[in-house]
């Protein structure tokens, strides 16, 4: 007797697969596509620390900052535009203890001891630059390349450029660590002006990880399949008479994907099959790290099963935004995030997945060397740190530098456009070759700007 999962899969492959089968591979927007050139990475996991973590207290030590603490930044630095306007506030010392880790001797603060153990896998970019000085613009740009809304997110561009290797799971998945609203909300994982089939699919906690996926108990599987087939026939007839309305094909594929996900998605998000040792590796055995540990483990399971792009929001609702009390704020957040992310790196490596899985860590900007409200730091898009690991990246290296106080990038500046171009390059996609025509215009993911930093590769 067929299980429900097997029946759903077989139904999707037979007459019920009308929406998918009626579209040839060339017309199917989610069909797997070849990269433009040899790829080093096949998939991406982006750990997004919403609110802006302090680079000065994590990956970019500044002895001069402590030496001159309590004094204003020298006049030679000129005017600094900050959202709170406190550019003349005294410099705030970092209370962190630093050590060099791995064979590379990569400096990491005592806030991140577990990630530090993977120093030789990390390429720390200390010279990131963005344009948004507030959260809405900064988060929007780090996701879409623009401080203005309405453009496709990086995950949507990857889905468009590479398609999916598993028709039963979303190509692009988004998760967050709490119930607070992420700044900008779904706009961050939107497909913008591209068909909605490329947008991110939310996965959440609780009994229903994927909202609205489960069929109501009163509706039988065969009944649901029949309704979908009938709707598909009507829509295909309409599409034949209105061939210019290509959005309909994308809608049909969305319906079909939702049906097929009912078979495979529940297994993909079922963590009961993971060993206790694996759960402990991710920190799921401790209250402080359980939530983020679960998300990181889910990310591994999704990419393992073919999802192209997974984004995890940590500190959703701008929790990393430490305008005051940075010691308490970052101590708690780093503890909640450090072990789970380190566990993800270790697990990917043990399974042979890290070599072609690109892991990205960072927020929309960093924090200022100047104090705010006495014991906090303001937003700093002028020079901050992110890191990448796996996916062809050469670990154990530091890229770029900020000035003596960590205010501005001064060497090997990498704008958000350069960062996005680098991610696409590692995936085998040329940022100028990846084009979507919208209203007659050739649109590109980096707005025709930026260059990949190819030296990041080993």
Per-range role (PLM):
Residues 1-458:
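Ligand-binding pockets and gating/stacking loops
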């Amino acid at each position: 007797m067929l299980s429900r999962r097997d029946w759903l899969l077989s139904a999707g492959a037979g007459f019920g697969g009308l929406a998918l089968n009626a579209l040839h591979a060339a017309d199917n927007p989610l069909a797997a596509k070849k990269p433009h050139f040899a790829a080093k990475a096949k998939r991406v996991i982006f750990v997004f620390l919403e609110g802006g973590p302090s680079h000065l207290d994590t990956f970019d030590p500044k002895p001069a900052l402590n030496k001159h603490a309590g004094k204003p930044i020298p006049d030679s630095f000129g005017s600094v535009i900050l959202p709170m306007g406190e550019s003349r506030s005294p410099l705030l010392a970092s209370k962190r203890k630093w050590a060099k880790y791995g064979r590379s001797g990569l400096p990491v603060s005592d806030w991140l001891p577990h990630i530090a153990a993977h120093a030789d896998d990390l390429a720390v970019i200390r010279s990131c630059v963005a344009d948004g000085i507030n959260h809405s613009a900064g988060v929007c740009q780090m996701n879409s390349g623009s401080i203005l809304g309405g453009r496709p997110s990086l995950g949507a561009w990857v889905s468009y450029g590479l398609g999916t290797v598993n028709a039963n799971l979303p190509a692009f998945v988004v998760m967050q660590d709490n119930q607070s609203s992420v700044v900008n909300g779904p706009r961050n994982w939107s497909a913008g002006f591209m068909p909605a089939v490329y947008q991110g699919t939310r996965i959440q906690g609780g009994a229903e990880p994927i909202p609205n996926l489960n069929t109501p108990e009163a509706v039988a599987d065969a009944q649901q399949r029949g309704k979908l087939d009938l709707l598909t026939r009507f829509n295909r007839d309409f599409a034949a008479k209105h061939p210019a309305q290509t959005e309909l094909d994308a809608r049909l594929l969305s319906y079909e994907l939702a049906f097929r996900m009912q078979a495979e998605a529940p297994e993909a998000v079922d963590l009961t099959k993971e060993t206790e040792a694996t759960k402990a590796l991710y920190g799921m055995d401790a209250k402080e790290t359980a939530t983020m540990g679960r998300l990181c483990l889910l990310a591994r399971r999704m990419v393992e099963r073919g999802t192209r792009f997974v984004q995890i929001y940590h500190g959703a609702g701008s929790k990393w935004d430490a305008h005051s009390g940075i010691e308490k704020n970052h101590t708690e957040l780093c503890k909640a995030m450090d072990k789970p992310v380190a566990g993800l790196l270790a697990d990917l490596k043990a399974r042979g997945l890290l070599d072609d899985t690109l892991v990205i860590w960072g927020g929309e900007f960093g924090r200022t060397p100047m104090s705010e409200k006495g014991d906090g730091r303001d937003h700093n898009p002028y020079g901050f740190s992110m890191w990448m690991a796996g996916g062809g990246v050469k670990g154990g290296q530091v890229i770029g530098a900020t000035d003596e106080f960590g205010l501005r990038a001064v060497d090997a500046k990498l704008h958000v456009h350069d960062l996005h171009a680098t991610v696409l390059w590692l995936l085998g996609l040329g940022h100028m070759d990846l084009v979507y025509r919208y209203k007659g215009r050739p649109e590109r993911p980096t707005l025709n700007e930026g260059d990949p930093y190819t030296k990041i590769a080993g």
